[in-house]
Amino acid sequence: MRLPREIGPIHFVGIGGIGMSGIAEVLCNLGYTVQGSDASEGANVVRLRDKGIKVTVGHRAENVSGADVLVVSTAIRRDNPELMAARAQRIPVVRRAEMLAELMRLKSCVAIAGTHGKTTTTSMVAALLDAGDFDPTVINGGIINAYGTNARLGAGEWMVVEADESDGTFLKLPTDVAIVTNVDPEHLDHFKTFDAVQDAFRSFVENVPFYGFAVMCIDHPVVQSMVGRIEDRRIVTYGENPQADARLVDLAPNGGGSHFKVVFRNRKTDAAHEVSDLVLPMPGRHNALNATAAIAVAHELGIPDATIRKAIAAFGGVKRRFTKTGEWNGVTIIDDYGHHPVEIAAVLKAARESTGGKVVAVVQPHRYTRLQSLFEEFCTCFNDADTVVVAEVYPAGEAPIAGIDRDHFVLGLRAHGHREVVPLQEPAALAGVIAGLAKPGDYVVCLGAGNITQWAYALPGELKALG
């Protein structure tokens, strides 16, 4: 039995969240009555209201009146008044991943998982399937610049979704094609151990049906090891590794982007097929690898090389993924969501390759627990930044941890050999700090999953106001 059409109002608690808003938008476009609430106003709330979805600011018991279904994410606490009211009224409560799974049952699906690169890779797969006239439905974890939203309803039989592993619920998603970009120690607050993280990703791949396939990056040692332990499923490997089925070769910087080839080698016949002259308008090896994963899916689904080449060249990117927010006196300001050491290192390497000037990193650490558990990694991931400006930790609802703060992080970076580390006393001081550091040709890269994105967009104007 599939999701029936006659379901009444579907109420989303926390509808403004990036994952929840995408599901709500697709359900609305399918013709379901959708409503919801969020703790605050925001761009996603405004967008959903513009589509005719009723959104209330604040969580109150009366908000669920008339709802037939309540959708919650794992971020919603058990004492949330709307959740309590729904349970008191015997209204069915559905987890976000379960509702996404119901939508996925209506289509053939590509699900993209991995500690890093999910959102960009999801957007690339969507762009390639779009170009191949698949007209896919898409639910992403970030705003796709080409759509101006993180979700769209397509008329085709395929669906492309970002599979969020943070709470383990990605194992509920029924997918025909699974991509695994990488697996690093992350979300240990949920999984407790890295072994448990790896087990979850292995199960994600093993859940693929016999007629589907997985696309896995064997440049990553953990993923390569996982490939060797997975039996009875078809796996297409990718990476710069010479053993990859889809091999990224001849990668070279190309202005603000990359130029490369992807060579496919058939394991049965050893025949090679080359997709050459690929130009991606995004810098960095990590983005070229993300593109290789998407190209591998497109190739398997029969999309012609010329279509792949054209779609990659036209890829418009994702909001908060190496997004240029403006310039000042020849200085380029970049906003990026990177908040894990692996992501930060990749972004700064891309910045280094994109400019002959200096790279100034402005980092707002995200969560005390993440900074604590990965402190050594954070202290060694800024090597491609000439200067690191460190803001206070963005708590994301967490209580402070003694010895885990901006000043200790500054000391840690210096102790690990970084030559220039500057503590940011307050956000209002950022423009003055950058004005004293940056010269024409330099890149200023704002990094973090908190409200640093607002600083990045305000910074060009604030710098101009200084003269």
UniProtKB/Swiss-Prot annotation:
Domain of life: Bacteria
Protein residues bound to ATP: G114, T115, H116, G117, K118, T119, T120
GO molecular function per UniProt: ATP binding; UDP-N-acetylmuramate-L-alanine ligase activity
Keyword DNA-binding: no
UniProt xrefs under Gene3D superfamilies: Mur ligase, C-terminal domain (3.90.190.20), Mur-like, catalytic domain (3.40.1190.10), NAD(P)-binding Rossmann-like Domain (3.40.50.720)
Entry's localization field: Cytoplasm
UniProt GO cellular component terms: cytoplasm
Biological process per Gene Ontology, one example term: peptidoglycan biosynthetic process
Reaction equations catalysed: UDP-N-acetyl-alpha-D-muramate + L-alanine + ATP = UDP-N-acetyl-alpha-D-muramoyl-L-alanine + ADP + phosphate + H(+)
Keyword field: ATP-binding, Cell cycle, Cell division, Cell shape, Cell wall biogenesis/degradation, Cytoplasm, Ligase, Nucleotide-binding, Peptidoglycan synthesis
Signal sequence bounds: none
EC number: 6.3.2.8
Pathway note: Cell wall biogenesis; peptidoglycan biosynthesis
Pfam families the record matches: Mur_ligase, Mur_ligase_C, Mur_ligase_M
Function comment: Cell wall formation.
Family label: Belongs to the MurCDEF family.
Name of this chain's protein: UDP-N-acetylmuramate--L-alanine ligase
Source taxonomy: Bacteria, Pseudomonadati, Pseudomonadota, Alphaproteobacteria, Hyphomicrobiales
Gene expressing this chain: murC
